[in-house]
C-alpha cells in the first residue's frame, strides 16, 4: 500500500494522469518482505527504504489533491461490496493521510485471512509497476483500475 483515499469518479482520470506522470519518473524498486504481520488477517511487512518512502510521499501528495479525507462515508463504496459496512475500514481510509501516511507510513502488502503459508523470510523482489485499485475487504486490492510501469535504469 503506497496510499489510500476516497476518489470521486469525476476525478479518477485526472488522478490516473498524475500517477502515470509519477511512474515515468520513478525507477523500479528493490524491496524486501521481512515477515507476516497480523493474526487472523495478515499482510507482508515490507522493509522501508528511502526510495519507497519518497514514492509513498509523492503518491500521497497526489492523492491529497483528489481524495475526500475525514468526511468520507459508506456511500462512497460500491453498493455490491461488503466493505461499505466495515466501519473500521471507512475510518482507516478516511484518516489514512493523517494516521498512516508520511512519517507514520508502514509499508505492507495486505493479503487476506486464513492460515499463513510457510515462507523463508526475507524475500527480495523488484516492484516494476504501481497501480490504482478499488478497495476490497479489509483494505485488499479488489479491482485494478489502472497500472503503470516504473522506469528502467541500467547500471554501467
Question: Which residues make up each language-model segment?
Answer:
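Histidine-dependent nucleotide/RNA phosphoesterase domain, centered on the 2H-phosphoesterase fold
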Residues: 1-156
Amino acid at each position: 500500500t503506497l496510499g489510500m483515499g476516497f476518489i470521486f469518479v469525476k476525478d479518477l482520470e485526472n488522478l490516473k494522469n498524475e500517477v502515470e506522470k509519477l511512474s515515468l519518473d520513478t525507477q523500479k524498486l528493490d524491496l524486501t518482505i521481512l515477515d507476516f504481520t497480523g493474526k487472523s488477517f495478515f499482510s507482508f511487512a515490507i522493509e522501508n527504504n528511502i526510495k519507497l518512502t519518497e514514492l509513498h510521499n509523492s503518491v500521497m501528495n497526489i492523492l491529497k489533491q483528489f481524495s475526500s479525507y475525514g468526511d468520507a462515508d459508506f456511500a462512497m463504496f460500491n453498493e455490491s461490496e461488503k466493505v461499505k459496512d466495515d466501519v473500521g475500514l471507512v475510518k482507516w481510509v478516511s484518516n489514512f493521510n493523517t494516521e498512516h501516511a508520511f512519517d507514520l507510513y508502514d509499508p505492507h502488502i495486505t493479503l487476506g485471512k486464513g492460515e499463513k503459508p510457510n515462507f523463508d523470510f526475507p524475500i527480495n523482489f523488484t516492484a516494476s509497476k504501481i497501480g490504482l485499485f478499488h478497495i476490497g475487504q479489509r483494505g485488499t486490492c479488489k479491482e485494478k483500475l489502472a497500472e503503470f510501469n516504473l522506469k528502467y535504469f541500467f547500471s554501467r
